[in-house]
Swiss-Prot record:
SUPFAM superfamilies in alphabetical order: Ribosomal protein S5 domain 2-like
Single GO term (MF): 3'-tRNA processing endoribonuclease activity
GO cellular component, one term: ribonuclease P complex
Protein name (Swiss-Prot/TrEMBL): Ribonuclease P protein component
EC assignment: 3.1.26.5
Coiled coil: none
Function of the protein: RNaseP catalyzes the removal of the 5'-leader sequence from pre-tRNA to produce the mature 5'-terminus. It can also cleave other RNA substrates such as 4.5S RNA. The protein component plays an auxiliary but essential role in vivo by binding to the 5'-leader sequence and broadening the substrate specificity of the ribozyme.
Catalytic activity entry: Endonucleolytic cleavage of RNA, removing 5'-extranucleotides from tRNA precursor
UniProt organism field: Mycobacterium avium (strain 104)
Quaternary structure annotation from Swiss-Prot or TrEMBL: Consists of a catalytic RNA component (M1 or rnpB) and a protein subunit.
Organismal lineage: Bacteria, Bacillati, Actinomycetota, Actinomycetes, Mycobacteriales
Enzyme class: hydrolase
Amino acid sequence: MLPARNRMTRSTEFDATVKHGTRMAQPDIVVHLRRDSEPDDESAGPRVGLVVGKAVGTAVQRHRVARRLRHVARALLGELEPSDRLVIRALPGSRTASSARLAQELQRCLRRMPAGTGP
């Protein structure tokens, strides 16, 4: 489970990250990363949001994918800057992907992101 301070909860945060952040795609996920130059609250740390749409599958399957992605994202919190905003969008293939594969894809996306990501 992601700590509350690291969860993206407002739709405005999601929208800004998806609209102004850098996008990187993998077979099972799409990652949007936005690095704020002046974050609202520096002590809060990085924030992560998940988007798991109905195309992924039934409610049970979507929740299973969301739990896996939360677990993977929590392990990577230490590698993110405090000002980072990260949105992970699950694609239909994520339903059958293992947690290890999702972790590998997320790490690959973060490694490939340019250094000065964001506005």
